[in-house]
């Protein structure tokens, strides 16, 4: 097993980076784990998990007398771990450690692989594509995003595919099944091993709150959003087989409850349902009583999820009593991602082995105008990798009078908010901190003060900030941290928060009501087993109606940033959508590159889309010390100039 190809360790939403020339988390050859942080102003540093295989009991790191702190932990149990750092008793998010979206926040993660299991590794097999697709929700008018996996060969072939709609758990979002779940790598490996039917997989954000809606356990009317917005979008924009025989729905935890509810409400639309760590197993009774035949009903849990297992056993007996089949599975583990990866792997192998007769049973999406969006709303300001269409909520677990889940989602305070007068309001929850400050992109340091209104928070309003994009570095007791309740990007060779201040005379980068293109993530392995991800933008309708011109523009990022920064900091997709929508440009593909991208990789990418090596290529590079605001302006002029 080659650890270099372990996507779980080396690929994350916001990747890890070197901290004082050391990794924040290192999996040693003997299976132990070493934690490290450079915090020269700290007196004490600790780490702790969330329970389960990584205890919530804090582990103290030892100072190395050179500003760093480290600890080596033996016999660390395999799993993907959410965890926390504590600097002088203040819980922080480490900007040099890998970050994903979980627990309604940017949260540090790392992985210890299970010996003998490589089903979720990045193997040297043909890789599918993950596409980021925007749609407008008919429920609340928000512009939202789905992550869509298409199998290897999808772009160049004429085949059509069945679709699995796959939902995340509470506190997570549409990014979870890719970055934490590794579902794309699992599918690549299953398809390469001929263990499953090639399929399209759609992962969407399950939060469908309306304005001023009282938020309860099932967050809004996601059922309607899936049926009336997401499925029509997928069937209009992807090569899919239609009809219930070619659709399945599944999810984990909260998502399992949503999947069960959706399948029970619409048995005419889905032929299979997967329930991973089912938190609303009682809804299965509606599926049991349905007159429609479900080809696969899969229920799973970790062996430490005792209450859920009791519910599964009860439902299995009920299915059997009525002469219907169901498949229960139990895996070693708690309520955590390794259980759900194995659940997904096993469920995927069951799917679409039956009659694939098609039926056009979904109406096309009715055009919906998104709400007027500006930079004072979270949807616009926080269009970042881990905060797209953010919820800004936490969860209070509760049960109703029948003992069924009925949790609430109270609002939380935004870490960064741009006010109506274009000031930046910053807030950080750090009740035990001695000092909190922010360092702006221009180098100015602003001290925060303890809030008189919100216990445990530090706050400040900063007037007259620079218009446009601003990096904001939060400091706790002199140590740089990530504010988990604010947008997160990547700069200065680490994760970093940012603020967007409206520009008076420039809006090409804003998220607007227009036809949206797609971002595609293409994966490759080099000869040393290193994995690279390359991001490609194609405009709306690319490949149809002579939209594509065969022209390519390659964007090269700054030395201390990564290629994905073009999406969330450069807002390249928004700029291209808006320029295309106004007829300024047409049919140009964008390849977002690191400084190390090779001509071979560029050639492989363009070949996927049928573009010849001889096609005209333009190059645009962000300066190493250039602000994103300046880069956006220059890029717009550049694109209009080459058209």
What do the PLM-derived regions correspond to, one by one?
Residues 2-16, 20-58, 62-435, 439-445, ...:
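Non-catalytic cap/lid and distal C-terminal segments of serine-dependent acyl enzymes
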